[in-house]
Amino acid sequence: EHINFMATYGRGLICLSISETRAEELKLPLMNPDNWKKKTTAFTVSIESSTNITTGISAFDRAETVKAAINPNFKSGDIVSPGHVFPLIAWDGGVLTRAGHTEAAVDISRLAGLNDSAVICEIMNDDGTMARVPDLIPYAKKHSINIGTIQDLIAYRIKNDLLIKKIPEKQHQIKNIYSDIFEFNVFENTIDGLHHATLHLGDLSKQDSVMTRVHPVQGFDDIIMNFNNPKTKDLHASIEKIKSHGSGIIVLINNPILGDLGKLSNDEKVKYYGLGAQIPVSYTHLTLPTSQL
């Protein structure tokens, strides 16, 4: 019934989002391995159930293929290629690793306590163009479908999933260029393994609010305080403000793509600023504001 609805009212390509683990179990090769490296949509070869189907294209046949592909008791021999269902591999970590529809579908299924897979389909308008938000709102009302955004899902997971792990052995004191002693801590992102750091002054656990800056690391510009870089200049101003206040924290987010946050999508900004907000929360039970210094 659902496959038939997608084919009739969705009109786009019907795909099956699955986890990396399940793709390995089924021994499904990527259609284009380069897509995985570039974090673009990871299509595998198309598939078909090896039993209980006829042509493979009917709604019933495609539903049977989906059921076979997600059934943990079924192995690679129960699936053949090519076929009429198109699997997509979701990155481990979901939308917090790649802000895509494939990952969003698997995340929602997991959050609902269901199998970590989902059938997805892009929606086309009657004239053959792709449906956008203004088209989707009346569409959702007509068919009684809820609407959600990847950005909202990212925000929900950041709020509810603990992504940051403190690395105690990296803890030590350093002096900044102002000769003030800041405590230096290193944190690991449990999703992608990247390390991030903090510089904090004072006991943050006893404060009602904490002066905070989330700063995308600017490399050598930050080291030499190159004020021609406006972000490094902002970092300097934040250090001065924390010094004057007597306490506060600077969260140093380490990621090569963060050199210019202005070029990131809203989804990526939510992800990285949300990550930055989780780190100071680990110092205290307080819920910190997401605004920057």
Predicted regions, residues:
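Catalytic domains of riboflavin
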Residues: 1-286, 291
